[in-house]
């Protein structure tokens, strides 16, 4: 059965995902409390210490991977998490990009997540939820082949299978032409 494993770094074409550290807490706090992000994510406690505590607890735990999205040798652009393994499926979320992130960052970071989960961790599907009012994001996922499993309490719940993920990896190959390199 697949399991979610942390990685120190995952390099893509122009982006890298690196494991979060307590030093990233200020960036994460600012990102999560920005007006553009806060409208579409779960509430963030109003103090930075809560974010530091969350990251510290994550580092001690297992069963999740939490990354800072950045240009390969550049400053942080966003965050993404893999969590909630259910058999062959994993959840991903906390996917937040700065408003001024390069246009390719959304597609490439999603491809990196799928490539890591399927090719390196052994998953064959994903599940996640998106707030209904966040049309830009749920439309993005639907273009990748995700299907709405249900909707309730202002959320759409999605599933995407291995065939749809493989089709998206092929369709958007120009954003990740050489796959990924994982450093544990």
Give the positions of each predicted feature.
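A short beta-loop-alpha structural element at the N-terminal edge
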Residues: 14-30
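Acetyl-CoA-dependent GNAT
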Residues: 46-93
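A short, internal acetyl-CoA/4′-phosphopantetheine-binding micro-motif in the GNAT/acyltransferase core
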Residues: 70, 94-106, 131
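A conserved beta-turn-beta hairpin within the catalytic core of GNAT-like acetyltransferases
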Residues: 84-93, 101, 105, 120-124, ...
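Conserved acetyl-CoA-binding loop-helix of GNAT-fold acetyltransferases
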Residues: 103-117, 139-143
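Conserved beta-strand-loop-alpha-helix junction that forms the acyl-donor binding cleft
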Residues: 127-138
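Conserved catalytic-core motifs of GNAT/GCN5-like acyltransferases
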Residues: 129, 145-162
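C-terminal "cap" of GNAT-fold acetyltransferases
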Residues: 154-184
């Amino acid at each position: 059965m697949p399991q979610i494993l942390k990685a120190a770094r995952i390099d893509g074409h122009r982006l890298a995902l690196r494991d979060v550290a307590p030093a990233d807490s200020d960036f994460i706090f600012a990102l999560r409390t920005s007006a553009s992000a806060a409208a579409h994510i779960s509430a963030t406690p109003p103090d930075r210490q809560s974010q530091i505590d969350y990251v510290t607890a994550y580092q001690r735990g297992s069963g999740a991977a939490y990354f800072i999205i950045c240009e390969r040798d550049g400053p942080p652009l966003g965050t993404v998490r893999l969590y909630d393994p259910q058999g062959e499926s994993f959840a991903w979320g906390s996917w937040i990009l700065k408003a001024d992130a390069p246009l390719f960052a959304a597609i490439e970071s999603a491809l990196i997540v799928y490539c890591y989960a399927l090719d390196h961790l052994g998953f064959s599907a994903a599940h996640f939820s998106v707030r209904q009012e966040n049309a830009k994001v749920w439309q993005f996922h639907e273009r990748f082949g995700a299907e709405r499993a249900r909707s309730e309490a202002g959320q759409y719940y999605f599933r995407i299978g291995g065939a749809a993920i493989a089709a998206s990896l092929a369709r958007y190959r120009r954003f990740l032409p050489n796959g990924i390199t994982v450093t544990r």
